[in-house]
């Protein structure tokens, strides 16, 4: 299929429109913010999963807390801004910003309470396996002596005691800043004074106390707990009358002016403004005296509905530091990614492996090193004349950046499109941009009004008197660290048509010229939305004409109303719709008369499901060789379809097509051990294997079964276990 022509046959039956009242009702959508909170609930549930080792359960708890922090910094901050501006426009599900805030606060209150309850259970569990977290009152005499010495030499120099009075006003507290508030009385005359101690942000939260012997339990105390033992050293001559910790979250959205002469300088200024964003959430220890609590709230101008009293630990995201303890018995068994055998068959020559035929690399089961190797080989190959590369997020000391710099220093034409608007990575991306420019790379920042989220690399090589192109496109970032824990797909091809399409995408980004002649790829905000809609409508037509019709989609989020409505219409026509949505899903599945043919599941497990795959039956039974199969950087959200540059790439090589459709998608649909079924009300329930079925864990399957396209000669000796779904073995109704 060289183009997108003939997605569906001509309509032969009258259109079956959904009832107009149902189509117009906002109740057909689940609220985006509440759906996200349901997703974070699923993450939190992994912290009570008895199948996970203890420290992995702590990790899931910390992830759920970190997720919630970012939700407030971005989503809640945006809704609060709408309320301040008097905006009453309703969300697709019919709620005003104020109504959404009420529901968010109710849901978050329950979620935060459950996080603390789970932590209390996990803390007891850790104590049972030799990891004990102690409070100041639990410190022994010998431990206090060691803590005192450590405090004096390693913590005391970092602390600045701050008295609060007319000469010393309440200081600025940064977002996520952790602070101890104090009520003090001068020993000499009893004069009261309020004071603060800011906890330093560059040292570990948990202090490990040396054990008497290697067989003794590990005992840890928080840095604030250690500091509380020695407040008299910070405020000599004062007595502590009351104290408590607090933590704030600030608005972290960036406001960028549309007219800007220097984009980098503009972002640097905006980042400075972000650090001083308004307070969105104030977390206060419940044990803090009421008078001191009121003082802190008043000083930070926090409204009552922005204050959360915490009966437990603050900054729960920092519990992830506990996973650094050397206790492999309490963690997942380490997994070492495979390297594609086909690359080894060619002596490590990535270009030769790609020339043989297209290749899909499935991360993290297959190493991201092959992507790095692709660019390193391009940098050192004298026949490579040009490299074009997008960068949205990458790692510290990035080998991707080093390879691009090396190529430029070797005299090759290198263009790097760096997205400055990658949230929370803006400063790092500015740094990479300057480093690359110094190396001679042509750095481009793309569109001011659009984020460039596409994952695309184009290498141009001189071969036999002409130029050949090698393309990498994927579903995940060029980030070696996250590639070890995110499941993503890397697609390599030397197909000249894909090469031309990739070149046109780069020209669009660097030259602003809209491409009118892209042959196979689809690009947002230009054609990607319509390509997906055309396919869904095509399957709808197949169903109405009595042919097999199916839509399989895997993504991180499904929010776009037009896509959802098209899926509803497909369901009404009898299309079988299977959706794997890790996070937000605004579609209501299984509603009679609306979506009874739509099933939605979410996979939450050891690895973070991140790949986007879109499959359409094309009038044949799924999975089948004639299906249209795509991978993409885009989720089905308005921001991806309308406000970002994204790429949707078809997979046409038979082996690659089979691997993605019949191995990866089937495994995701088959999974029962890490899957949740989305219910019509937006909540979800854990899936279980059907009666007579063996439980199936897709992550375990891919850790123990090699891929198809990367096997090379080894495929003749052994191939991955073929997967079948229960529905495939049942006769059609």
Curated annotation (Swiss-Prot):
Its EC number is 2.7.4.1. An intermediate of this reaction is the autophosphorylated ppk in which a phosphate is covalently linked to a histidine residue through a N-P bond. Mg(2+) binds at residues 393, 423. GO terms for cellular component: polyphosphate kinase complex. GO terms for biological process: polyphosphate biosynthetic process. It comes from the Bacteria. The active site is at 453 (phosphohistidine intermediate). The keyword Phosphoprotein applies. Keywords: ATP-binding, Kinase, Magnesium, Metal-binding, Nucleotide-binding, Phosphoprotein, Transferase. One of its GO terms (molecular function) is metal ion binding. NCBIfam families: poly_P_kin, PRK05443.1-1, PRK05443.1-2, PRK05443.1-4, PRK05443.2-2. This is Polyphosphate kinase. It comes from Nitrobacter winogradskyi (strain ATCC 25391 / DSM 10237 / CIP 104748 / NCIMB 11846 / Nb-255).
């Amino acid at each position: 299929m060289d183009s997108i022509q003939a997605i569906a046959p001509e309509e032969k039956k009258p259109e079956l429109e959904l009832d107009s009242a149902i189509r117009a009702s906002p109740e057909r959508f689940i609220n985006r913010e509440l759906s996200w909170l349901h997703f974070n609930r699923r993450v939190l549930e992994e912290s009570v999963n008895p199948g996970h080792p203890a420290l992995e359960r702590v990790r899931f708890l910390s992830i759920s807390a970190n997720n919630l922090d970012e939700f407030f910094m971005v989503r809640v901050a945006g809704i609060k801004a709408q309320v301040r501006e008097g905006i009453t426009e309703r969300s697709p599900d019919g709620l005003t910003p104020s109504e959404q805030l009420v529901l968010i606060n109710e849901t978050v209150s329950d979620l935060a309470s459950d996080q603390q309850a789970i932590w209390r259970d996990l803390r007891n569990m850790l104590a049972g396996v030799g990891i004990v977290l102690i409070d100041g009152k639990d410190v022994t005499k010998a431990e206090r002596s060691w803590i005192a010495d450590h405090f004096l030499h390693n913590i005391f120099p970092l602390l600045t005691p701050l008295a609060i009075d007319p000469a010393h006003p309440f200081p600025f507290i940064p977002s996520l800043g952790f602070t101890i508030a104090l009520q003090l009385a001068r020993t000499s005359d009893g004069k009261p004074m309020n004071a603060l101690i800011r906890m330093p942000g560059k040292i570990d939260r948990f202090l490990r106390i040396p054990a008497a012997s290697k067989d003794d339990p590990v005992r840890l105390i928080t840095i604030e707990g250690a500091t509380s033992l020695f407040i008299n050293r910070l405020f000599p001559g004062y007595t502590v009358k009351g104290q408590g910790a607090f933590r704030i979250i600030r608005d972290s959205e960036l406001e960028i002016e549309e007219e800007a002469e220097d984009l980098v300088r503009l972002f640097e200024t905006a980042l400075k403004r972000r650090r001083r964003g308004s307070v969105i959430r104030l977390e206060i220890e419940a044990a803090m005296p009421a008078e001191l609590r009121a003082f802190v709230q008043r000083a930070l101008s926090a409204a009552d509905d922005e204050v959360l009293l915490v009966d437990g630990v603050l900054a729960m995201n920092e519990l992830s530091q506990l996973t650094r303890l050397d206790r492999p018995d309490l963690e997942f068994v380490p997994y070492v990614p495979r390297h594609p055998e086909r690359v080894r068959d060619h002596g490590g020559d990535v270009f030769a492996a790609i020339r043989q035929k297209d290749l899909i690399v499935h991360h993290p089961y297959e190493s991201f090193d092959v992507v790095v190797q692709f660019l390193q080989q391009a940098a050192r190959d004298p026949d490579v004349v040009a490299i074009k590369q997008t960068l949205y997020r990458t790692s510290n000391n990035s080998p991707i950046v080093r390879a691009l710099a090396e190529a430029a220093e070797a005299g090759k034409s290198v263009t790097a499109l760096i997205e400055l608007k990658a949230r929370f990575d803006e400063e790092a991306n500015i740094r990479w941009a300057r480093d690359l420019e110094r190396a001679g790379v042509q750095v481009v920042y793309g569109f001011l009004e659009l984020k460039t989220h596409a994952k695309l690399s184009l290498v141009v090589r001189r071969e036999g008197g002409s130029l050949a192109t090698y393309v990498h496109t994927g579903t995940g970032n060029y980030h070696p660290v996250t590639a070890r824990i995110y499941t993503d797909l890397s697609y390599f091809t030397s197909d000249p048509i894909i090469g031309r399409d990739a070149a046109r995408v780069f020209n669009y980004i660097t030259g602003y010229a809209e491409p009118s002649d892209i042959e196979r790829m689809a690009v947002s905000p230009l054609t990607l939305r319509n390509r997906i809609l055309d396919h869904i409508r095509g399957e709808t037509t197949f169903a109405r004409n009595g042919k097999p019709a199916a839509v399989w989609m895997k993504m991180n989020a499904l929010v776009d109303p037009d896509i959802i409505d098209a899926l509803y219409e497909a369901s009404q026509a009898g299309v079988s719709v299977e959706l794997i949505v890790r996070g937000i899903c605004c579609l209501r599945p299984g509603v009679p008369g609306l979506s009874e043919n739509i099933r939605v599941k979410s996979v939450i497990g050891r690895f973070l499901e991140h790949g986007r795959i879109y499959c359409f039956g094309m009038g044949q039974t799924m999975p089948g060789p004639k299906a249209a199969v795509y991978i993409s950087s885009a989720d089905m959200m308005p921001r991806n379809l309308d406000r970002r540059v994204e790429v949707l790439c078809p997979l046409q090589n038979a082996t690659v097509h089979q691997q993605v459709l019949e191995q990866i998608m089937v495994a995701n649909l088959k999974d029962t051990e890490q899957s949740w079924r989305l219910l019509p009300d937006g909540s979800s329930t854990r899936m279980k294997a059907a009666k007579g079925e063996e439980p199936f864990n897709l992550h375990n399957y891919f850790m123990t079964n090699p891929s198809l396209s990367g096997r090379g000669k080894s495929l003749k000796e052994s191939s991955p276990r073929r997967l079948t779904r229960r529905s495939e073995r049942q006769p059609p109704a």
